[in-house]
From Swiss-Prot:
Keywords: Iron, Iron-sulfur, Metal-binding. It comes from Albidiferax ferrireducens (strain ATCC BAA-621 / DSM 15236 / T118) (Rhodoferax ferrireducens). Belongs to the HesB/IscA family. Its cofactor is iron-sulfur cluster. GO terms for biological process: iron-sulfur cluster assembly. Pfam families: Fe-S_biosyn (PF01521). Gene3D superfamilies: HesB-like domain. The keyword Ribosomal protein does not apply. The keyword Oxidoreductase does not apply. It comes from the Bacteria. This is Putative iron-sulfur cluster insertion protein ErpA. HAMAP family: Fe_S_insert_ErpA (MF_01380). PANTHER family: IRON-SULFUR CLUSTER ASSEMBLY 2 HOMOLOG, MITOCHONDRIAL. Homodimer.
Length: 120
């Protein structure tokens, strides 16, 4: 009698939520630049009124320590240091009466400033 081990593969949820709205806006911006190799890099750096601040830039290069996520054909890059601060976060794009901007909702942030781009 032979035993067959059944392997069940489950897809783990992404530790960072990159919304459809954010992916669509990034796709529009990449199309405007005319460079399909661009990826959105999201990072955390020291600064801002609460100690850390979020940053966004386009990058063509994926570094060895980057975590890469893809949503609707758009790639998001996060370096290893920033990743630890962004686990569980939602990266969204909002348009309202106050303007249009990328927004990060981060459950790891204990305090945030009024501008929403700085946290501790």
């Amino acid at each position: 009698m032979s035993a067959v081990a059944e392997t069940i593969q489950t897809e783990m949820p992404s530790p960072i939520l990159f919304t459809d709205s954010a992916a669509a806006k990034v796709a529009d911006l990449i199309a405007e630049e005319g460079n399909p190799d661009l990826k959105l890099r999201v990072f955390v750096q020291g600064g801002g009124c609460s100690g850390f601040q979020y940053g966004f830039t386009f990058d063509e290069i994926t570094n060895e320590d980057d975590t890469t996520m893809t949503k609707n054909g758009v790639s998001l890059l996060i370096d290893a240091m920033s990743y630890q601060y962004l686990v569980g976060a939602e990266i969204d794009y909002k348009e309202d009466l106050e303007g249009a901007q990328f927004v990060i909702k981060n459950p790891n942030a204990t305090t945030t400033c009024g501008c929403g781009s700085s946290f501790s």
